[in-house]
């Protein structure tokens, strides 16, 4: 995986940061957020302009196949890898704050479906969910219909030409607002890419 750390974070080893686990889309891997998405530059600029709080961003590979099973395109064991391997590793090797209030999970396309699934399964572990061009909204909808703990905020975004996804997001946001879950929707120019 790749891990973004804020500029100067090594200067004060006692300082701890919130963490965002960020998943890629279909046909990509963890390098997409750095090479195509330029996440490191975007984060540096947002932090410098005081538009984003300092945080650590962890970008791992979605494709965690289950040993002994046929390798299917939809990663079957991502949730286990995230909860049992990735989060414990990050929390012991990087200066992150621990606990639900300091941990968020987001993804693009397929990564958004995986993020929503993991947040639904582990609501005590994540305070925020981000779905960018989310293709599977089933788990996101469960967030507002289940009685279990809800994320503090759910952020949706999509391209202006993703009309079906946009309508689905609007329906879910309405349900989330009714269940008193903060839901933010942004539409950016374009289609199904890093808008």
Stretches with model-predicted labels:
Residues 1-195:
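Non-catalytic cap/lid and distal C-terminal segments of serine-dependent acyl enzymes
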């Amino acid at each position: 995986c790749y891990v973004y750390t804020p500029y100067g974070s090594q200067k004060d080893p006692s300082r701890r940061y919130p963490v965002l686990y960020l998943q890629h889309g279909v046909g990509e891997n963890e390098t997409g957020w750095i090479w195509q998405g330029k996440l490191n530059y975007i984060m540096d600029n947002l932090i410098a302009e005081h538009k984003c709080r300092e945080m650590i961003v962890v970008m791992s590979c979605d494709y965690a196949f289950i040993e002994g099973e046929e390798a299917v395109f939809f990663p079957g064991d991502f949730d286990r890898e995230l909860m049992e391997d990735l989060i414990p590793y990050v929390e012991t090797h990087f200066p992150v704050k621990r606990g639900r209030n300091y941990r968020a999970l987001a993804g693009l396309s397929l990564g958004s479906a995986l993020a929503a699934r993991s947040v639904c399964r582990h609501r005590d572990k994540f305070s925020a969910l981000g779905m960018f061009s989310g293709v599977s909204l089933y788990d996101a909808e469960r967030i507002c219909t289940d009685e279990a703990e809800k994320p503090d905020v759910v952020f949706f975004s999509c391209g202006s030409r993703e009309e079906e996804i946009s309508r689905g997001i609007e329906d879910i946001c309405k349900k989330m607002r009714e269940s008193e879950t903060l839901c933010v929707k942004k539409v950016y120019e374009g289609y199904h890419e890093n808008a």
